[in-house]
Amino acid sequence: QVRLLRKSTEQTHLCLGTPALSRFHPDRFALELLHVILGANMSSRLFREVREKRGLVYEIGTHIKRFKDTGAFVIYAGCDAGKLSTTIRTIVAELARIKRERIHAGELRRAKEFYSGQLLMGLEDTVEHMLWIGEQAVTVGRVARPQDLLTHIERVTPQQVQRAARRIFVPERLFLAVVGPVPQQQVATLQQLCAL
């Protein structure tokens, strides 16, 4: 599904999202690493391919939301309106690639190290630490130690990351929202581009 809000903006903003895994799903740790590999930092696949290599976007990244019974995986990008179709085509190609090709051990190792570093550094902040405790107490009913989470992350295999990608990146479950100076007649083309 595609939603377009025509607006006279300097750049076109897009969010490509899909329902994802709940905070209790067995593959939730693999999803965290899928997020890191695809778009959590400047070494991620989308940043390197879409921004650095092709110069299509000003900004790109992924975000995940975890809820009790579902979740969301969202890719955000900001680009020129004239580069919108190519940007979406390139993003979708990367999603198809991660479903098709197993992640190399070195890439997974770097993702685990990044995740671990971000978690531990984030918890040094008092507010972040309070949010860590409060969110778990309210949603799960108990508070896990950071080391427990990192143990689960450490056990994730390339096969599990690929399985998570195959589970969530399904063409009929992809939703695209676009804000910018894009003609309404381009919606049909955008829908076709979202087919993995």
Which residues does each predicted region cover?
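Solvent-exposed alpha-helices and their adjacent loops that cap or buttress functional pockets
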Residues: 6-9, 66-67, 168-169
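Short, conserved charged micro-motifs
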Residues: 26, 83-86, 184-188
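His/Glu-based metal-binding/catalytic segments typifying zinc-dependent metallopeptidases
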Residues: 1-44
